[in-house]
Amino acid sequence: MRFFARYEADLLEKKVRRQIADQVHPKMVLYYNSGDRDYSDAAKAITAAIGAFTRASLQFTFCVTGDGWNEGAATSERWGRYRKWRTANGENRRLYDAPWHQFEHHESEQLSKVVEFALQLGWDAIVCAEPGRQLLLLSHDDRIEIYRGFEWRRLAEKLIAFGYWPR
């Protein structure tokens, strides 16, 4: 697993945003009610929907409550779990300073964990994977947009079974 600095993440995000521009509308948009609950099943379903990836990434782009290092989040149990996970994986920079999480093919459990954190903490995040230029967006507005790949029909069925709904 690697964490990319802000300037590297910005370059990678521009590349991904161009891919989004190629496909104006997502293939599927799902909604959910956020809150302090268990997102592990949804995160595992999203990760499994990628299939056999060579490289997968999640980029934090925004969160209403900040990046977990501000004063308001300092006492948050959920943000504390994320900071502890991040430190345990060798990253001590703030999330704003190193927002891009990259995973190799054997790190699907770690990818699933960071997707779970993104859902739980209400991030705007880009999830992408290779091969196949797979692309999914998570939104703090309780929305998941599937643009490309992710076995999107099957993933939608699983997420709907977990209480998510289409628009």
Language model features with spans:
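Structured alpha/beta or helical-core interaction and ligand-binding surfaces enriched in interleaved
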Residues: 1-167
